[in-house]
Amino acid sequence: MNTYKIYLINFDDGFIYVGKTKNTLIHRLKQHKANLISGKSYKLYEHWKSIDIDPSIECLECNLSKKKAIQLEHDYTLAYMFLNQ
């Protein structure tokens, strides 16, 4: 069974990113650089490139099924958007 992780990338300037991956986070970020995909993943990469701030990265949840990871990614994204208003 593939297990997923939910992680939070938090920049000091208020920009946050919540994402899910079944790979390591480093591998996932390399995928972002290799495949400049649209959406919030691309916004993360562009923001990271444009500033000189190293973000804090933390794992919020691990050992999740894909279905649960998708739901939690959505829930955490909404929660952090609400907190940063």
Q: Model-found features: residue ranges?
A:
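Structure-specific nucleic-acid interaction/processing domains
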Residues: M1-Q85
